[in-house]
Amino acid sequence: MSLTETPICNFGEKAQSFNLLSTNNERLTLNNIKGKNGTLIMFICNHCPYVKAIIKYISEEVIFFETLGIKSVAIMSNDIKNYPEDSFENMIKFSKLYNFSFPYLIDSTQEIAKKYKAVCTPDFFAYNKNLELQYRGRFRELKNMQTDKK
């Protein structure tokens, strides 16, 4: 996925269900990962310079969200033939490198990304406790942020 204009948030839209493989070799569903007070679904990948620029901050924020009862999950939907850096093996390495405290799932058919209408990486979808969309968009302004060289 490339940098594109994020569509307007359709407030109240329900989260789409999924059943995907995590980097811990577990199949996880939306019901498995939803939080008591909310759920953050992030579409990311390993090779994206924008993801690399903010991944440390994402990891830190997710820990804070957890204290609020908000669970987080990241989904990688890129075609690994076109982006070998995003392979499942590299997802495992990436999640360990950045100490992910949240599940990192592979969507190898892009079915889930299409259901969510994810258009770029990173693309964030924040839901309330009833899994109704409250925010859709970017993490924060990316101007002047440097790519992590790890």
Name what the model sees in each region.
Residues 1-150:
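Chalcogenol-based redox active-site neighborhoods
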